[in-house]
């Protein structure tokens, strides 16, 4: 029974750490950019877009495809950084235990 009580205590501590990690990730802002900074995106650590800036020189109606590509590239850059921050936060919570690829708990 002592082991069960210890496990319950550990589970409770891990839950508190996960909640703190989620809160930290929600307030973390990561920047992504493309086109030498002509397009920038800001995402939360949970991947929610908060800002998109486009340099006015890219507003060329005859070349909208380049603008679209740069927006996607900037978003992808920021998303990669947000996922890295999330993975790092989870490693801190799990004590370095690597979770299986694709497992995105609790996010």
From Swiss-Prot:
Q: Any idea which UniProt keywords this protein has?
A: Cytoplasm, DNA-binding
| InterPro entries for the chain | YbaB-like_sf, YbaB/EbfC
User: What would be one Gene Ontology cellular-component term for the protein?
Assistant: bacterial nucleoid
Q: Could you give a GO molecular-function term held by this entry?
A: DNA binding
Q: Which cysteine pairs make disulfide bonds?
A: none
Where in the cell is the protein located? Cytoplasm, Nucleoid
Pfam families xrefs: YbaB_DNA_bd
Q: Quick check: keyword ATP-binding in the entry? A: no
Q: Which SUPFAM superfamilies match?
A: YbaB-like
Q: Does the keyword Transmembrane helix apply?
A: no
Q: How does it assemble?
A: Homodimer.
The family classification in the record reads:
Belongs to the YbaB/EbfC family.
Q: What does this protein do?
A: Binds to DNA and alters its conformation. May be involved in regulation of gene expression, nucleoid organization and DNA protection.
Q: What is this protein called?
A: Nucleoid-associated protein GOX0603
In which organism is this protein found? Gluconobacter oxydans (strain 621H)
């Amino acid at each position: 029974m002592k082991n069960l009580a210890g496990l319950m205590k550990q589970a409770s501590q891990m839950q508190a750490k996960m909640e703190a990690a989620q809160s930290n990730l929600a307030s973390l802002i990561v920047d992504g950019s493309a086109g030498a900074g002509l397009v920038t995106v800001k995402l939360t650590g949970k991947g929610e877009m908060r800002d998109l800036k486009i340099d006015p020189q890219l507003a060329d109606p005859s070349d909208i495809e380049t603008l679209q590509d740069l927006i996607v590239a900037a978003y992808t850059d920021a998303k990669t950084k947000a996922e890295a921050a999330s993975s790092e936060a989870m490693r801190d919570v799990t004590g370095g235990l690597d979770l299986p690829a694709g497992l995105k708990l609790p996010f």
